[in-house]
Design a protein with these regions (language model features):
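Hydrophobic faces of well-ordered beta-strands that scaffold small-molecule active sites
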Residues: 36-42, 65-67, 98-103, 129-131, ...
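Mobile, glycine- and charge-enriched loop segments
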Residues: 29-44, 88, 92, 97, ...
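Glycine-rich, proline-tolerant flexible connector loops at the mouths of alpha/beta enzymes
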Residues: 68-86
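Active-site beta-loop-alpha junctions enriched in small/polar residues
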Residues: 41-45, 68-72, 103-106, 134-136, ...
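Catalytic-core regions built around general acid/base machinery
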Residues: 83-90, 152-159, 217, 254-257
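Active-site acidic/histidine proton-transfer and metal-coordination neighborhood
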Residues: 11-20, 51-54, 71, 94, ...
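Histidine-acidic metal/acid-base catalytic patches
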Residues: 2-37, 48-58, 125, 182-201, ...
Length: 303
């Protein structure tokens, strides 16, 4: 019986030819070990002060983070002019930078303080941000809904280009999410250069949605891949269960596929299987140890 892992290994060489073409959407230099720049998505550390966050990330052992700056994040949009510089300063004191800002932005609006958030980020040296998802409604044809997105996307890309910061879209599984299947959002992206609109590509969600065809989703996103997300999962019946990076269906074969395509951009580790929050006794140490273990796995895959 051919497993998903076997399929991944046997298709990597063939897909290398399919991927040959345009360069990365946003190339980044390699990490200190000669591998990629590795960031950490710090959602599981929300609730720490800026200094506490910087200290925890330094203990984990990465030099950059993807920082949530959205409702419920490290910094709220309403406070971004004051608090984001403080966060950047605290991180810099520990040799850490922000490689990606996670936002609630998918259109130019006062509600999300789009221009203020993006201009503040750019002024602090942040080069890219993750967009919020677009959502489907069950009450309207899908193609018509994609057409409705186009003006909002056009205005956001134009503002981002003016500011000099790159918008990135994550493929997230689920029937309501535009981009879950990749093809729909990829069709909208074709109107723009990769430097102006890119993917934060999530292999977990691609595998969940793609079944045996997920390598085609990777190939479709590859020329616009600004950052590659790493996390893992298991199926519990029909339910997706997040798990440590070493324990799920995704393995080092995916890294071989990226290497075969000459991917040299940054990668980001997501630790999404922990229960609890930083306010609970013992959680922080557990989160640091889990992050370290996943980081060691990720580095071993790239070695």
């Amino acid at each position: 019986m051919t497993t998903r892992r076997d399929f991944l290994r046997t298709t990597s060489a063939a897909l290398a030819g399919l991927w040959a073409g345009p360069a990365l959407a946003a190339p980044a230099g390699p990490g200190a070990s000669g591998g990629p720049e590795i960031s950490l998505f710090t959602k599981h550390l929300i609730g720490l002060s800026h200094r506490e966050l910087a200290s925890a990330v330094a203990r984990i052992g990465v030099a950059s983070i993807e920082a949530p700056v959205r409702p419920g994040g490290h910094v709220l949009p309403a406070q971004v002019e004051v608090e984001l510089p403080k966060l950047v300063e605290a991180l810099a004191a520990n040799g850490i930078k922000i490689s990606m800002l996670t936002t609630g932005i998918n259109a130019v609006s006062e509600a999300t303080r789009t221009e203020v958030v993006l201009r503040t980020a750019k002024a602090l040296g942040i080069q890219r941000y993750r967009m919020n998802w677009y959502a489907y409604s069950p009450d309207k044809p899908l193609w018509a809904q994609l057409d409705d997105i186009k003006p909002r996307l056009r205005d956001l890309v134009a503002l981002s280009k003016e500011i000099g910061i790159q918008p990135c879209y994550q493929n997230h599984s689920g029937a309501k999410n535009v981009g879950a299947a990749v093809w729909d959002m990829a069709a909208l992206m074709r109107d723009y250069r990769p430097a102006d609109l890119a993917w934060s590509f999530d292999i977990l969600h691609a595998t969940v949605e793609g079944g045996l065809s997920w390598p085609n989703q990777v190939a479709l996103a590859r020329e616009r891949m600004a950052m590659a997300y790493f996390k893992n999962f298991r199926w519990q019946g029909r339910v997706v269960e997040s798990c440590p990076l070493a324990d799920g269906l995704i393995d080092a074969g995916y890294v071989k596929m990226l290497k075969a395509s000459a991917y040299q951009g940054p990668v980001c580790l997501h630790v999404e299987y922990l229960k609890g929050s930083v306010g609970e006794p013992g959680y922080l140490e557990k989160a640091i140890e889990a992050s370290r273990a996943d980081l060691a796995t990720l580095r071993s895959w790239w070695s």
